[in-house]
């Protein structure tokens, strides 16, 4: 396919038009008084959002050069969202500011490479300043609530829900978001270990009202193969039944013949038993069975360990205070495992989380960690309409991810103030040459931009507020929601340090690429010939007979 090529100033100008088109659409959402953006959908209701990355992802421009510029900034927003969970709009605003300032200097004849070096040096200095300003969150759930509230577009209800969810399942616990049936937003907590496998036969049910099998102080047999005949199973089944305690069987599968025998015994002699399939697949199944064994103080009966089912003894069975098995889920509460062993297993999983490169694997490992260490909280998001539901879920997701970022690297004063305080660290900083120093100056000017934009969206004059905030010290800043200058930390206006850091690093990275671009190649649009209305001379076919 033929290509079009554009060089030098013309190339950068076209790219910048694309950057501005996308950034101007995204930045209206910044700050507590930021506005919503309505996105048309081909099917269904339009999507209303105040989430920067959602807006960015929807933008495709008709002009190929401009669209390339827009895609560059879209990358900033997406990467910041992936890395820090929030700060997508801030990153977009910073990228636009660095590009605009940098382009003026490059057009005036400055060396793009030297400017990029100056930008990189300044960013490293600002990141140091942000880290120095950060205050750890620890177990202070009030601070967690503040971060969640700000990230959820200043919705105190969502902030409180996330803090409550973290209280219930600890900071490392898994919190998932689901749609509620009604209009209320609530928390549900699944205590203990729950996995998504239910009973193999409805005849195991003990509570017909809830259609659940409930067991108090059961023995738990964990087997990693299929139970195909009852002969191998009897040596452990008989002594377990004689104790009078219920028995939960977790196996890869139970053959229909063996299952029928268990069901018949359950019905005739009130044998307290329930069989479920093992959770997961492949290697993950082995790991999850090992987790269950450690949690319940049992042993996985596996031929890999040299153990056969017929050799199993009562000592190899796990136990727990309570087990509930429904059609789809099995929940084990208060397993009788040794605390030290459980902690050791948790540490092992944490090490795997750090080492893994795959997001999917990391998510699954975090789920396993939560199930071992405390449980899973579910945030049921309720709303009056589907449109509101989508918007609210976006905000809850933002808030949850920002809260995790805050726990990781601490919190800083919000409202763009941390960047303003970082300007002092750039005072008097010089590069190796004049153009590098210009690059440092570009960052110095650009990091004012998030505050200017927050103020502009609140209907005030940015330059005036920036000057007043610069004159203050520490946490003193402008609270756009209440239109008051105050101590932002005390007022609960805080941001995760990680979000501010990642937003600036990603914005500077893409802007640096942009400024050092000398040529843009895009596909040439080919005019498609219109389809002919009909072949000539085909009319008047009446006399064919």
From Swiss-Prot:
Q: Which Gene3D superfamilies does the annotation name?
A: GroEL, GroEL-like equatorial domain, TCP-1-like chaperonin intermediate domain
User: Could you say which residues bind ATP here?
Assistant: 29-32, 50, 86-90, 415, 495
Q: Name one Pfam family in it.
A: Cpn60_TCP1
Disulphide-bridged cysteine pairs: none
Q: What enzyme class is recorded for this protein?
A: isomerase
Q: Write out the GO cellular component annotations.
A: GroEL-GroES complex
Under Enzyme Commission nomenclature, its number is 5.6.1.7
Q: Which domain of life is it from?
A: Bacteria
Q: Please provide the record's keywords in A-Z order.
A: ATP-binding, Chaperone, Cytoplasm, Isomerase, Nucleotide-binding
* GO MF annotations, alphabetized: ATP binding; ATP-dependent protein folding chaperone; isomerase activity; unfolded protein binding
Reactions catalysed according to its record: ATP + H2O + a folded polypeptide = ADP + phosphate + an unfolded polypeptide
GO biological process, alphabetically ordered: chaperone cofactor-dependent protein refolding; protein refolding; response to heat
Enumerate the subcellular locations listed in this protein's record, separating them with semicolons. Cytoplasm
HAMAP family hit by this protein: CH60
The family line of this record is:
Belongs to the chaperonin (HSP60) family.
Subunit note = Forms a cylinder of 14 subunits composed of two heptameric rings stacked back-to-back. Interacts with the co-chaperonin GroES.
Physiological role: Together with its co-chaperonin GroES, plays an essential role in assisting protein folding. The GroEL-GroES system forms a nano-cage that allows encapsulation of the non-native substrate proteins and provides a physical environment optimized to promote and accelerate protein folding.
Q: What is this protein called?
A: Chaperonin GroEL
By which gene is this protein encoded?
A: groEL
């Amino acid at each position: 396919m033929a290509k079009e090529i554009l060089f030098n100033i013309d190339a950068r100008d076209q790219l910048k038009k694309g950057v501005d088109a996308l950034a101007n659409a995204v930045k209206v959402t910044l700050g507590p008084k930021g506005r919503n953006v309505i996105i048309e959908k081909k099917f269904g209701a339009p999507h209303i959002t105040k989430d920067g990355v959602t807006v960015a992802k929807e933008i495709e421009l008709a002009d190929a050069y401009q669209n390339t510029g827009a895609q560059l900034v879209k990358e900033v927003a997406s990467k910041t969202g992936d890395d820090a969970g929030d700060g997508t709009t801030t990153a977009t605003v910073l990228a636009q500011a660095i590009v605009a300032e940098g382009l003026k200097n490059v057009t005036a004849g400055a060396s793009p490479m030297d400017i990029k070096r100056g930008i990189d040096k300044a960013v490293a200095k600002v990141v140091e300043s942000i880290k120095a300003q950060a205050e750890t969150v620890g177990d202070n759930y009030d601070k967690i609530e503040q971060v969640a509230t700000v990230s959820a577009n200043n919705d105190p209800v969502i902030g409180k829900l996330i803090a409550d969810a973290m209280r219930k399942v600890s900071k490392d616990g898994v919190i998932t978001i689901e749609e509620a049936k009604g209009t209320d937003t609530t928390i549900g907590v699944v205590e203990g270990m729950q996995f998504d496998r239910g009973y193999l036969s409805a005849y195991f049910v003990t509570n017909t009202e809830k259609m659940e099998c409930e067991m108090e102080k059961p023995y738990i047999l964990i087997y990693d193969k299929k139970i195909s005949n009852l002969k191998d199973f009897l040596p452990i089944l008989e002594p377990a039944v004689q104790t009078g305690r219920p028995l939960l069987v977790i196996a890869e599968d139970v053959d229909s013949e063996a299952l029928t025998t268990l069901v018949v015994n359950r019905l005739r002699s009130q044998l307290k038993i329930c069989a479920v399939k093992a959770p997961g697949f492949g290697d993950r199944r082995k790991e999850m069975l090992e987790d269950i064994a450690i949690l319940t103080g049992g042993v996985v009966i596996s031929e890999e360990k040299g153990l056969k089912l017929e050799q199993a003894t009562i000592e190899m069975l796990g136990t727990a205070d309570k087990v509930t098995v429904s059609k789809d889920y099995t929940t084990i509460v208060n397993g009788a495992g040794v605390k030290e062993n459980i902690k050791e297993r948790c540490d092992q999983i944490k090490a795997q989380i750090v080492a893994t490169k795959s997001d999917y694997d990391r998510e699954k490992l975090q789920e396993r960690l939560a199930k071992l260490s405390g449980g899973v909280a579910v945030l049921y998001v309720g709303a009056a309409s589907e449109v509101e539901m989508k918007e609210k879920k976006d905000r809850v997701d933002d808030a949850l991810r920002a809260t995790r970022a805050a726990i990781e690297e601490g919190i800083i004063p919000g409202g763009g103030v941390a960047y303003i305080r970082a300007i002092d660290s750039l005072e008097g900083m010089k590069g190796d040459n004049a153009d590098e120093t210009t690059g440092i100056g570009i960052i110095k000017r650009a990091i004012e931009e998030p505050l200017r934009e927050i103020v502009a969206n609140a209907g005030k004059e940015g330059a005036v507020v920036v000057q007043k905030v610069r004159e203050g010290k520490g946490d003193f800043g402008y609270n756009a929601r209440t239109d008051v200058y105050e101590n932002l930390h005390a007022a609960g206006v805080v941001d995760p340090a990680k979000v501010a850091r990642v937003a600036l690093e990603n914005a500077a990275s893409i802007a640096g690429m942009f400024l050092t671009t000398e040529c843009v190649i895009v596909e040439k649009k080919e005019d498609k010939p219109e389809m002919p209305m009909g072949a000539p001379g085909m009319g008047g076919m009446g006399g064919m007979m």
